Regions:
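N-terminal leader/linker segments that initiate helical-solenoid repeat arrays
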Residues: 2, 16-66, 70-78, 82-85, ...
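Bacterial N-terminal signal peptides
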Residues: 8-17
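Terminal, low-structured helical/coil segments at or just beyond the last alpha-helical repeat
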Residues: 21-34, 41, 231-275
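Helix-start (N-cap) detector for alpha-helical repeat units in TPR-like alpha-solenoids
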Residues: 61-62, 95-96, 129-130, 145, ...
């Protein structure tokens, strides 16, 4: 039998993309609740073994939660929802399963159901940091910034070592034009998870906003070291180089962005300015 709760929210990662354009928050359908995909085939093996566990222990809520997470890794969101539903039917106080189901609903663009599940998770456990974080991301995407900010404050209070809540709160401060507080939050996110690219990119955007172009170049390069196929990262690097007056590197960076995403607006506008 799988241990109770099996470490809470399993694989549905509240991954926040950096802003799509400088000073803007990603639209509601962009990187709302990403699931780590499994290219190794391990999830299929896990699903089979977890199905055996469930057959032997049909009232094991943690096994349903774990298999639901494996389904989500494979992009099988309806199967994931079904398993998370079984988990909360067996254990109505299983906050992590409500959060996981909410994240699966977000992938299915069923935001009303997702919001209801985040709320229910907090009824089950008012101190569940992941539920505050997940609800904040949804509220942020819907433009409800004060409510999202309040949820992120709670998430950080409950889990001060979590990088994602600092990153998410930094994006809200950035949207509000408070780049000083945004940079502080991005610093905290990077301190806690130095291998995530999005906080570097977001901090680079805030550095541009406050005129620290050398620091912005460093941050966009750091983001691109994590993901060199990030068109927005190349476009942001182009803006930073352009602000420095380095025309050649700006053109090169904008060109790299266009080669990845020919419709990247920041890069297209940058190339138009420099032609």
């Amino acid at each position: 039998m799988i241990s109770p709760r099996f470490a809470g929210v399993l694989v549905l990662a509240l991954t926040l993309a950096a802003c799509n354009s400088l000073g803007a928050i990603a639209p509601p359908d962009a990187h709302i609740a990403e699931v780590e995909s499994d290219q190794s085939g391990a999830s299929a093996v896990n699903i089979a073994s977890l199905s055996d566990v469930i057959q032997r222990n049909p009232n094991d809520s943690a096994a349903y939660n774990t298999r639901g997470a494996a389904y989500a890794r494979n992009g099988r969101y309806q199967n994931a929802v079904d398993d998370f539903t079984h988990a909360v039917q067996i254990d109505p106080a299983f906050a992590a399963a409500y959060v996981n189901r909410a994240l699966a609903y977000r992938q299915m663009h069923k935001d009303n159901l997702a919001l209801a599940d985040f709320n229910q998770a907090l009824v089950a456990n008012p101190n569940h940091a992941a539920a505050y974080l997940g609800r904040a991301n949804l509220l942020r995407a819907q433009g409800h910034l004060p409510e999202a900010l309040a949820d992120l404050d709670q998430a950080i209070r409950l889990n001060p070592e979590g990088a994602q809540a600092f990153h998410a709160r930094g994006l809200i401060y950035q949207r509000q034009g408070d780049n000083a507080h945004a940079i502080t939050d991005f610093n905290n996110a990077i301190d806690r998870d130095p291998f995530a690219g999005a906080p570097y990119q977001a901090r680079g955007e805030s550095y541009i906003a406050v005129g620290k172009y050398d620091a912005a170049v460093e941050d966009f390069n750091a983001a691109l070291n994590v993901d060199s196929h990030n068109a927005d990262g190349w476009a942001g690097l182009g803006v930073a180089y352009e602000k420095q007056g380095n025309r050649a590197k700006a053109v090169e960076s904008y060109g790299r962005a266009i080669s990845i995403d020919r419709n990247n607006q920041t890069a297209r506008e940058g190339l138009d300015r420099l032609r």
